[in-house]
Amino acid sequence: MMISEIRQELTDHIIPFWNKLRDDENGGFYGYLSYGLELDKKADKGVILHSRILWFYSNAYMTLGGDELLDNAKHAYEFIKNNCIDYEYGGVYWMMDFEGKPADTMKHTYNIAFAIYALSSYYRASGDKEALALAYRLFEDIEKNTLDEYGYREAFDRQWRLVDNEALSENGLKADKTMNAILHLIEAYTELYKADGNEKVADRLKFQLGQMRDIVYTPDTNALKVFFDTAFNLVGDIHSYGHDIEATWLMDRACDVLGDEDLKKQFAEMDLKISHNIQDIALEDGALNNERDKNEIDKTRVWWVQAEAVVGFINAYQHSGDEKFLESAKSVWENIKEYIIDKREGGEWYSEVTFDHTPHDYKETVGPWKCPYHNGRMCMEVITRGVDI
């Protein structure tokens, strides 16, 4: 039942919605659609948004087939290749204007990771070796420019001079390093290794997994720390429920793709503990709360957190056989259907909904961070994993 509903959500709602945002005049996809569903054709175009769109269409094509999906993937790829990559200094820009010229030339490890993730997927979908070469180019840019003695630094100007990491900091905190960036490096390097089996990529992926296991994970609480200074001293006291449940299945996937049996065993055990913890402390009224900051729980229902919860709980069920995880996945999907999916003509998913189910009307429908990657990926993961309820 759930698979057929989610397949229909992907094919009849999410894909048609994003198809309409293709910009054939200036390239790429339009960068902003308001909560009121007003399209701004002259809004800046986020590079993260475009990497996620490229990943989405590439994987939708590999999951469903269909020339239109591959054509839209190619359209996103051409925009990234021709506009977003800095061929002089390396990396990708942070933001383009509506015509495809650089609007913000900041370099960010997280942003470059998403470009690698997308280009690797596009190579797998299309066989275009130029896309794989660009993914490796960006991989080398990260490895050459962002490492210090402890790990990966995150925020730089165009010429790789360190700047404040405002893009991934929040709650009034400034962090030099974040769990979020490490997680999405793992995601990107997993996809690149899956595409081509390069051992240097495997070595760096194992290093990142080791950081998650040995530094970011807290065995006492079965939770992931969020913000750090340069030397990985903790900054703040935040627990991000969505990132925890997303990390469980992404780390399991990385170990599966690497084929390392010792790592698979270690992480399956750790990830199940994290999944149980999230189920116990964050699942409330059929949905996942957002985060804890010190002693305050933010109960906002954020679209991407709900999508990752469905995948994470299904993954935990597959590793444990515990039916409670399936029940949790089902409850979150039912909540998504009822309250997160925007049923207005021309809508997609609400960005955020309050605990009592009121959408936040100040949060856009499409923007630099609001994309088809989390909800689209949830649909594809449910379809390919084949676990039904």
Curated annotation (Swiss-Prot):
GO terms for molecular function: cellobiose epimerase activity. It is an enzyme of class 5 (isomerase). SUPFAM superfamilies: Six-hairpin glycosidases. Its EC number is 5.1.3.11. One of its GO terms (biological process) is carbohydrate metabolic process. Keywords: Isomerase. The keyword Isomerase applies. Gene3D superfamilies: 1.50.10.10. It catalyses: D-cellobiose = beta-D-glucosyl-(1->4)-D-mannopyranose. The keyword Isomerase applies. It comes from the Bacteria. Pfam families: GlcNAc_2-epim. InterPro entries: 6-hairpin_glycosidase_sf (IPR008928), 6hp_glycosidase-like_sf (IPR012341), AGE/CE (IPR010819), Cellobiose_2_epim (IPR028584). Belongs to the cellobiose 2-epimerase family. Catalyzes the reversible epimerization of cellobiose to 4-O-beta-D-glucopyranosyl-D-mannose (Glc-Man). This is Cellobiose 2-epimerase.
